[in-house]
Design a protein with these regions (language model features):
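Beta-barrel outer-membrane channel/assembly domains of diderm bacteria
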Residues: 27-152, 174, 178, 247-259, ...
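Active-site beta-loop-alpha junctions enriched in small/polar residues
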Residues: 59-61, 104-106, 190-192, 230-234, ...
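Outer-membrane beta-barrel proteins
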Residues: 74-77, 161-170, 203, 266-278, ...
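Transmembrane beta-strand segments of outer-membrane beta-barrel domains in Gram-negative
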Residues: 218-280, 284
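Acidic/polar loop patches that form or flank catalytic/metal-binding clefts of enzymes
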Residues: 224-226, 258-260, 290-301, 308-312
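A surface-exposed, glycine/aromatic-enriched loop/edge motif typical of exported proteins
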Residues: 299-325, 383
């Protein structure tokens, strides 16, 4: 993302900005051990430790949303613009100590937005205050080699996984990680926001504590298997004390085939003291026709988060994700997108999602993805947890349905725009076609079947440098 030192510009670039858990996160602050032949230096000569490195970048997304309430008769369309500039620096005074600071300056602007919106529930929603922020994304001390093969991390750290299904964001942590040959592991305790680290305004501290143990094995050819235990404790009482047990894997056993799998079991207690007994699953595979022009590919995926059809029995069987996820992924294309649909943009909770994706590379720096989703509830409900819509389902007496609807997304990724290597553009457009669960009254008492809800849509254009 930017120039780094002298002869080893590219060697640690991915480590500065890519903090995947636990892979890139564990390697995020590791100096290169040596340079491969023909890459960064003379064969057989070790690369010198870099005492510092830095990176910078920018993202500027335009976000348009239409009909979040799925009713053309109510005005709730919005067009927002957000600019983000970030920079990071890592300093290594010795081989065993590293300090990293990453900050992000951002502000969101409303180009078009209603000053007051009445939601289908009857509530009145006002637009939020939008002020500039200067956030500390990472402020981390790393100690290694002192108790090798263990590593100690203390401070604010960014965690991500490939599909953003478990983690995508920063937490204030104390962690101990282990790395030896094909095994990597990490144990940590954390608070979502322990310190208010916004230089321009006060940010509320998040009263959610986490404890996690994560381990993966990489002894297979281009494949990873992992397991984790994550305990969350919301001290404010809003989210309860969930305990998640997870198994996951992903890989690319050949140039043509790639796959992923997520399986999680939810235990612990919810905010009402009910026991969690829920499960979630997300599996998929992509096949690439490498011998054909434009590298066409096809993806099939299935996701299922259990629901709770009997909420009064003292057992909550509705699956919830970690609360740290954003569910963004990509298949073979250049751009990430919302894995469960751009317009719905929901958590995997009380929901089944069937997905078919078709992709191609129109040019070396241009990718296309067309993604279709089919949604269905596991238990009757009026809404889906943490979705982007404001509409309500199953409001007609005697007309309940589990048919949520369908969605179609188009994702176009550009890299190296106008010959500028670092300049990119992501275009993501989605339309949601509501199903029978969204039928609403049309004002005609004789029409007990009601009317179909209107379509919703979203468009995001994100420039990146």
């Amino acid at each position: 993302m930017g120039p780094i030192g002298k002869a080893t510009t590219r060697a640690l670039l991915a480590g500065v900005l890519g903090a995947a858990l636990p892979g890139a996160a564990l390697a995020q602050f590791e100096a290169p051990k040596g340079a491969p032949a023909g890459t960064f230096g003379t064969p057989g000569q070790p690369t010198a430790r870099l005492s510092y490195q830095y990176a910078y970048g920018m993202e500027s997304p335009f976000t348009y949303r239409r009909n979040k309430d799925l009713d053309n008769g109510l005005r709730d369309n919005s067009l927002l613009f957000k600019t983000k500039v970030f920079g990071s620096i890592t300093y290594r005074p010795t081989d065993w100590l590293a300090a990293t600071l990453e900050m992000k300056l951002g502000r969101e602007y409303a180009i078009r937005e209603e000053q007051q919106i009445q939601l289908p529930s009857g509530d009145i929603r006002l637009p939020p205050r939008r002020e500039p922020t200067l956030l500390v994304e990472q402020a981390l001390i790393t100690v290694r080699q002192v108790i090798a093969p263990f590593e100690i991390n203390l401070g604010r750290r960014n965690y991500e996984d490939d599909r953003h299904w478990v983690f995508d964001g920063s937490m204030d942590v104390a962690s101990l990680s282990y790395r030896h040959e094909n095994v990597r592991a990490e144990a940590m305790v954390a608070r979502d926001v322990l310190w208010s680290l916004d230089a321009l305004r006060h940010s509320n501290k998040a009263r959610i504590e986490s404890a996690m143990v994560y381990a993966d094995y990489r002894g297979f050819d281009n494949q990873v298997l992992a397991a984790y235990v994550l305990k969350r404790n919301d001290l404010s009482g809003n989210e309860g004390r969930p305990l998640m047990l997870g198994l996951r894997g992903h890989g690319k056993p050949s140039a043509a085939f790639s796959w992923w799998a997520e399986a999680a079991w939810l235990r612990g207690h919810d905010e009402n003291g009910n026991r969690f007994r829920a499960h979630g699953l997300d599996v998929g595979a992509t096949y690439r026709f490498a011998d054909l022009p434009f590298d066409p590919n096809i993806t099939l995926a299935y996701a299922n988060g259990s629901g709770d059809g009997n909420p009064g029995d003292g057992v909550n069987t509705e699956f919830r994700q970690t609360g740290l996820q954003t569910n963004e992924a990509k298949y073979i294309g250049l751009s990430k997108f919302k894995a469960y649909g751009e317009t719905l943009d929901s958590e995997l909770s009380n929901l089944r999602v069937m997905t078919l994706g078709l992709g191609a590379r129109a040019a070396p720096g241009v990718s296309l993805d067309l993604v279709y989703h089919r949604y269905r509830l596991n238990a009757y409900a009026s809404e889906i947890r943490n979705w982007a819509l404001t509409a309500q389902m199953n409001t007609l007496a005697g007309q309940q349905s589990k048919d949520v609807g369908q969605a179609l997304d188009l994702v176009v990724g550009f890299r190296g725009l106008f010959g500028v290597r670092r300049l990119g553009l992501d275009l993501r457009a989605g339309v949601f076609m509501p199903g029978q669960a969204f039928r609403t009254a049309d004002g005609n008492l004789a029409n007990t079947a009601g009317r179909r809800a209107d379509r919703g849509a979203s468009v995001i254009a994100k420039f990146r440098y």
